[in-house]
Amino acid sequence: MRFEDVAEILRVVGRAIALGCRDHYDAGQRAAVFASYASVLFVEALGPYEAVVAELEGRIVAYAQLDAATSRLRALFVDAECQGRGVGRALLADVEGRASRRGCARLHGAMSLNAVAFYARAGFRALGGEERLMSASEGVHISVVRMEKRLRA
């Protein structure tokens, strides 16, 4: 990811949240999640995390972020119009490979409710039930499921 990609990534994140999350989160929750990502994305683009994008026809359509130091998948968003076309699976496989090459034995994260089935199909397992996290924006609570996957060495 390049710093100049941030605006296009925000477009992808915004569409993924607005359309992909609407069956699991209300408008206020979706707005808080987007605001949280938007407020830190510029800083994170320059930070210690590894950001990866997927492109179709020269256009960014998906974004993921890996924190290899903690083996955490911090984000994975696919533009709503590209969901269900294998873009997310391909990007997740790329991130898993990067994590494995950096010595991560597992990959974990707090997964949104709309993405739990996606991660389960990819081999992740739930570490418990739903839990509520406070969004960094306006004190809104968001339900997530913590999941992890063991990676091949």
Regions found by a protein language model. Give the residues of each.
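Conserved active-site tyrosine of GNAT-family acetyltransferases
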Residues: Y119, F124
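Acetyl-CoA-dependent GNAT
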Residues: F3-E4, R11-E81, L92-D94, R98, ...
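Small/polar loops that bind or transfer phosphate-bearing groups
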Residues: M1, A110-M111
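Short secondary-structure boundary/hinge segments and terminal tails
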Residues: S100, A117, A136-E138
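Flexible nucleotide-binding loop
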Residues: R85
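Conserved catalytic-core motifs of GNAT/GCN5-like acyltransferases
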Residues: H108-A110, R125-R146
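Short coil/turn motifs at beta-sheet boundaries
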Residues: D5, R102, E138-I142
